[in-house]
Amino acid sequence: MRSLLLLSAFCLLEAALAAEVKKPAAAAAPGTAEKLSPKAATLAERSAGLAFSLYQAMAKDQAVENILVSPVVVASSLGLVSLGGKATTASQAKAVLSAEQLRDEEVHAGLGELLRSLSNSTARNVTWKLGSRLYGPSSVSFADDFVRTASSTTTASTPRSTSATSAALQSINEWAAQTTDGKLPEVTKDVERTDGALLVNAMFFKPHWDEKFHHKMVDNRGFMVTRSYTVGVMMMHRTGLYNYYDDEKEKLQIVEMPLAHKLSSLIILMPHHVEPLERLEKLLTKEQLKIWMGKMQKKAVAISLPKGVVEVTHDLQKHLAGLGLTEAIDKNKADLSRMSGKKDLYLASVFHATAFELDTDGNPFDQDIYGREELRSPKLFYADHPFIFLVRDTQSGSLLFIGRLVRPKGDKMRDEL
């Protein structure tokens, strides 16, 4: 492979961002969110806006099926580009984030604060293992000032040189697998260029429900990828009280499921029937989501969800370019001289790899609720066909994740007419 030969040696800047790896100095107590500074709160709002523009850009790519991105992690990557860039290269990174009025250091520091708060597993009782690494070719050395600033805001280690030949990319894959408990064994299979910087994010996220699913309420069902193609998946079922809205005009349902400690929630949007998600995606904006959520009411809902792990790796380079990040990825125009001290570096790839697990785990549920009148005749939310989902922070409104499930893992079951 050409890329293996090119990456004979590289410098490395690593940021271990997960709370499991390095916890904030003043960790919030369980169930208590840290109060964000004004700049971090502003960037939380900006990252939520980025979530929808990036999702829409990816949804238009015919080669993409399942989508799974963490907008706050992508925003943090943009912050690193603005910190290490100059002139238009830096200003474009901030423009994609709608943070033009903030200084580069403020953007990077604010995003670091936001990400540390959102990934605090002690406060939130979720599993979020997150690692971020910046690789450069062996000919490039990271500037001391850049390393110092990046380290002070993202708990990054100092750069180090790692010699490798054909094992260079394999070492990245091994790190990603270790970071995600083996859920992501290969994140660099689509590497084409290694003469520039590689920014790699690897994540494993597992929400813990505010009210768990019963482990026996799991069985094998069909998930209809299309009307004529069905795969077998494990589905988990439970009935409870959830925020719910049925938009009969647009023929879609939306349900909000609180996660443990209720600091964040999983929001699922699903068409009434099996159809491509294009129609729903055209409706989806930050403003429209707010309208839908404003119409939600607490109702009894019988929910069925696919159980298992969704593993997705994206190279976001071209999608970020479509949003305006054109200079950083251009070998002839990029000015990342605050990273290396000279204009000898460009952003070759932005790998964003995530394993997202839906399981039954969560807090014990109140068994007495099942004798109440309010749980009779529940609304049905049967997620057996493609849907869009978001993990939203209840305090800041920022999105930890946004994605769609179009084709889960599973064997073909049957053709349907």
Curated annotation (Swiss-Prot):
| Glycosylation: residue positions | N120, N125
Q: Where found in the cell?
A: Endoplasmic reticulum lumen
InterPro entries given in the database record: Serpin_CS, Serpin_dom, Serpin_fam, Serpin_sf, Serpin_sf_1, Serpin_sf_2
Checking SUPFAM superfamilies in the record gives: Serpins
In this UniProt entry, which cysteines form S-S bonds? none
Per the UniProt record, the site (Reactive bond homolog) maps to R376, S377
Q: Where, by residue number, is the motif Prevents secretion from ER?
A: 414-417
| Post-translational modification N6-succinyllysine, affected residues | K94, K295
Q: Please provide the Gene Ontology terms (biological process) for this protein.
A: collagen fibril organization
Point out the signal peptide segment.
1-18
Q: Which Pfam families match?
A: Serpin
Q: Name one GO cellular component term.
A: endoplasmic reticulum lumen
One GO molecular-function entry: serine-type endopeptidase inhibitor activity
Residues bearing Phosphoserine?
A: S141
Keywords assigned by UniProt? Acetylation, Chaperone, Endoplasmic reticulum, Glycoprotein, Phosphoprotein, Signal
Residues that bear N6-acetyllysine: K206, K318
Give the protein's function: Binds specifically to collagen. Could be involved as a chaperone in the biosynthetic pathway of collagen.
Q: Which family does the record claim for this protein?
A: Belongs to the serpin family.
Q: What is this protein called?
A: Serpin H1
Q: Which organism is it from?
A: Pongo abelii
